[in-house]
Amino acid sequence: LDHFNYHSDGRLLVEDTAIEDIIKKSGTPAYVYSRATIERHWKAFDNAAGSHPHLICYAVKANSNLGVLNLMARLGSGFDIVSVGELLRVIQAGGDPKKVVFSGVGKTEIEISTALQAGIHCFNVESISELYRINEVAGCLNKKAPISIRINPNIDAGTHPYISTGLKENKFGIEIEQASTVYNIASELPFLEVKGVDCHIGSQLTEIEPFLEALDKLLILIDSLATQGITIEHLDLGGGLGVPYNGETPPQPAQYMHAIIERMNGRKLKLIFEPGRAIMANAGVLVTKVEFLKLNDHKNFAIVDAAMNDLIRPALYSAWQNIIPLNNKLNDPETRPSRVYDVVGPICETGDFLGKDRSLTIAEGDHLVIRSAGAYGATMSSNYNSRCRPAEIMVDGDKAFVVRQREKHIELWRGEHVLP
């Protein structure tokens, strides 16, 4: 559930604030987030785990705004990071590095060193070469590096190929058939401390079964390692729980967590979860202005001021996100006849679209709201076509706070230089 609802007068509210009042000050395009929704979604995971030992590590890549990260830190959240930049963001936002897990296939020596000195909870190791690198860096610092090994269980998550991560042909993790060998190597390296088993099979999963299939394989591995004298303290099941973009019915966090814990059969192994999209996607929207309506014989276009540089998911993944009017009472058929439009941006590429074949009752100058934009929206934005990235606004009840100012044009060439 989220806190975006239409008022009886047709205005779209986020919590107790009309979005039209926000954009009068911020302009468009603008991302708007709901604090209450973010906190509700995070607590849905934390509460569902109940008394079972657990740590909820928010996936920073989903939305790394300091305002978002600070809310997570206040809740006591852990964090799943994939770069030293994300680690520094977490620390800047007040997050506890002792609750940070560091994922990713290409950790540099500087990143490993910075994370070790910050005292992170664990490295999720993706290759044998990485094991040796972490051991070497930890040795130079005279520290023990806590590690888990990311296992690739060869599970088809049934999701978009770009965000499927648990098959043998994906770049992530160690094949499960090699896991025992790699754990034995890790246990013998002097500056490593084996802590856990890690797995992340993909993103936007809408069924529980792939998670349970992966869990079964991992529990067999953990039992096998125990017979070899390697004790596993935690099991990190990653993230990946989907959200309803277009009528999907993914499991609720409580259903997902209860199924996982039930499958544990009474084991008190600490569980780590890394939700990102499931917390943030429906906690944010992208608001955009209709600049022009272009009516052709075969296709109608609503040309808006947001573009693929602001929200790349539709162009990159052919992702479907609901597009609704900012005011649903502006529907006079004389001035706003209902038509089917492709909603497109100003960027000079045919792939610059936010939605195709959408039935809308709009006029030039109206505003549209792109739902489910709180995850992988602003965080994947760019300056393509030398466009300034949008403002980000956090709503808390009847108050709205700018958590990222709209970029200024002069910032576009900061750090660039011409030849003498």
Task: Give the label of every model feature segment.
Residues 1, 153-294, 354, 358, ...:
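Active-site loop/helix belt of alpha/beta enzymes
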Residues 1-145, 184, 189-193, 220-223, ...:
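A charged N-terminal "starter" segment
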Residues 23, 259, 268-420:
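Charged (often Lys/Glu-rich) extended helix/loop segments that serve as interaction or gating elements
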Residues 38, 61, 83, 115, ...:
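Conserved, mostly hydrophobic/aromatic
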Residues 57-58, 79, 103-104, 123-126, ...:
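Glycine- and other small-residue-rich loops at beta-strand/loop junctions that grip anionic moieties
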Residues 62-64, 85-86, 106-107, 127-129, ...:
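Active-site-proximal loop/turn and secondary-structure-junction residues that shape catalytic pockets
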Residues 69, 92-93, 112-117, 134-137, ...:
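Short acidic, glycine/serine/threonine-rich loops at helix termini
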Residues 79-80, 100, 123, 197, ...:
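Hydrophobic residues within beta-strands of alpha/beta enzymes
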